[in-house]
Amino acid sequence: MARFALTIVRHGETRYNKEKLLQGQGIDEPLSEMGFKQADAAGRFLSNVRFTHVFSSDLIRAKQTACAIMRNNQLSEDIKIMYDPRLRERKYGDAEGRPLSELKVMAKKAGGQCPSYTPPGGETLEQVRACAKDFFEYLCQLVMAESSVKEKSELGASGMVGIMSTDLAPFVNHNKEPTIFGESRDVTLDASVLLVSHGAYMRNWIKYFVEDLQFTFPPELKKSRELSVSPNTGISHFIVTVGSGATRKPEIQCVCINLHGHLSDIDADTSHYQV
C-alpha cells in the first residue's frame, strides 16, 4: 500500500482568459500581468508544503505557473519540474481563439450543449478523461514502485515525507474537520505531488474521481459548484491511498477543491464558470 498527497493547481490568468476566449491546445498564450501575480500568490500559499514530485502541462501558461509556485517554495529544493503533454487542456479544434459564447452557439446549432459538445477538430470529453485516467494511473504506479524500493532499502528513507499537521495547515484550515487523518497528528506519506494543469482538464479529472473511483464530496462542498471550472490558480488537494491488489481502486480523500483565498489581496476574478 502507498499513500500520497496530491495538489492540483490551475494555471494563472492569460489575456485569453480575461477576454473569455478559448485557448485549448492550439493557442499557447503566456500569463498576463495578473496571471503572474496569481501564480506568485499560489506559490506563497504553498510555500511551506513539501513536494517530492512536480508535474506540469507543457503549455506555456502552465509552465510559467509551475515555475512561480516552485520559486516561492521553501521546502522543495532541487525538485525538477516534469512537463507532460497528458496534462494539456482539452483541445477545442475550430473553436480555439473564439469567444466562449460562440462555442455555445456552435453547440446549439449542432443540437448539443456545452460541455459535452465537441467542435470540429476538438477532443471529446471521453478523450480528455482517458488522458486524466492514464496520467493518474501512471502516478499511482510511480508512487507504488518508489514506495516498494524504499521499503527494501535502508538508504531510501530520504524520499519519505513526514507530514505533520503544520505541513497541511494551508489546507486543513479551510476544512471543517480538524484533521483529515482522524486522531493522528503525525502521518508519513510516500510522496507529495504537485500538478499544474488547466480548467476543463481539471474538471474532467475530478469527474473521473467521482464517476469511476466513487469519490464523494465532503458535505460542506456543493457538487455543482465544485464540478464547474476552477478559477485561475484555484487549488485542489487530495490524499490518495493505493492498494496493492490489481483490482482495488485507489481511495480518494478530499481536503479542498478550487480553493482561491490566496487571491483575496490581488483583486483577481475568482468566479466559477461552465465551459
UniProtKB/Swiss-Prot annotation:
<feature type="site" description="Transition state stabilizer">
    <location>
        <position position="198"/>
    </location>
</feature>
<feature type="active site" description="Tele-phosphohistidine intermediate">
    <location>
        <position position="11"/>
    </location>
</feature>
<dbReference type="GO" id="GO:0006915">
    <property type="term" value="P:apoptotic process"/>
</dbReference>
<protein>
    <recommendedName>
        <fullName>Fructose-2,6-bisphosphatase TIGAR</fullName>
        <ecNumber>3.1.3.46</ecNumber>
    </recommendedName>
</protein>
<dbReference type="GO" id="GO:0005737">
    <property type="term" value="C:cytoplasm"/>
</dbReference>
<comment type="function">
    <text>Fructose-bisphosphatase hydrolyzing fructose-2,6-bisphosphate as well as fructose-1,6-bisphosphate. Acts as a negative regulator of glycolysis by lowering intracellular levels of fructose-2,6-bisphosphate in a p53/TP53-dependent manner, resulting in the pentose phosphate pathway (PPP) activation and NADPH production. Contributes to the generation of reduced glutathione to cause a decrease in intracellular reactive oxygen species (ROS) content, correlating with its ability to protect cells from oxidative or metabolic stress-induced cell death. May play a role in mitophagy inhibition.</text>
</comment>
<dbReference type="InterPro" id="IPR051695">
    <property type="entry name" value="Phosphoglycerate_Mutase"/>
</dbReference>
<dbReference type="GO" id="GO:0006914">
    <property type="term" value="P:autophagy"/>
</dbReference>
<dbReference type="GO" id="GO:0005634">
    <property type="term" value="C:nucleus"/>
</dbReference>
<dbReference type="InterPro" id="IPR013078">
    <property type="entry name" value="His_Pase_superF_clade-1"/>
</dbReference>
<comment type="similarity">
    <text>Belongs to the phosphoglycerate mutase family.</text>
</comment>
<dbReference type="GO" id="GO:0005739">
    <property type="term" value="C:mitochondrion"/>
</dbReference>
<dbReference type="Pfam" id="PF00300">
    <property type="entry name" value="His_Phos_1"/>
</dbReference>
<keyword id="KW-0539">Nucleus</keyword>
<keyword id="KW-0053">Apoptosis</keyword>
<keyword id="KW-0072">Autophagy</keyword>
<keyword id="KW-0496">Mitochondrion</keyword>
<dbReference type="GO" id="GO:0004331">
    <property type="term" value="F:fructose-2,6-bisphosphate 2-phosphatase activity"/>
</dbReference>
<dbReference type="InterPro" id="IPR001345">
    <property type="entry name" value="PG/BPGM_mutase_AS"/>
</dbReference>
<keyword id="KW-0963">Cytoplasm</keyword>
<keyword id="KW-0378">Hydrolase</keyword>
<feature type="active site" description="Proton donor/acceptor">
    <location>
        <position position="89"/>
    </location>
</feature>
<dbReference type="GO" id="GO:0045820">
    <property type="term" value="P:negative regulation of glycolytic process"/>
</dbReference>
<dbReference type="GO" id="GO:0043456">
    <property type="term" value="P:regulation of pentose-phosphate shunt"/>
</dbReference>
<dbReference type="GO" id="GO:0005741">
    <property type="term" value="C:mitochondrial outer membrane"/>
</dbReference>
<dbReference type="GO" id="GO:0005829">
    <property type="term" value="C:cytosol"/>
</dbReference>
<dbReference type="InterPro" id="IPR029033">
    <property type="entry name" value="His_PPase_superfam"/>
</dbReference>
